């Protein structure tokens, strides 16, 4: 059995991609798919010296080589769950930057709980769910890969002008008169509250 887009629609794609041409004969980023007890996975060999980034919000360095990330996010106050390795955003996405600066992005099109491992020689996603698709974007730079990703999944709408650069912490206000003072200040500045 294989992947069926009608049975398992994508939550990531803006629209179904269309074929743009033939695959280059020297193409090296070939995913290998596997099933273990009904749980799907995929792995891809990566060129030596490739720097890997992605996977979502976790503590540690941006460079993900040699790391395994659990893709099952949580609201982790004080980074207490799994030592900050499962924070607010989980992304089944890895970007690789080769030694020559050319880059690729890999989107594992699944929302199942998963582990994303980015070893020096391969990238592997092991999900707890059914078969999924893998999309590979291979371009001349990291910027071009991100542009390709936005063409595939879409972009976010522009935030309201008042929100540009604005951060309002709501962790603790005491006493209640302070909350009312802040709300009055918001209204004076025409910021929704």
Describe the residue ranges of each PLM region.
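Primarily the dimerization/phosphotransfer
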Residues: 192
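Catalytic and substrate-binding clefts that recognize carbohydrates or anionic sugar/phosphate headgroups
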Residues: 1-163, 170-172, 176, 183-188
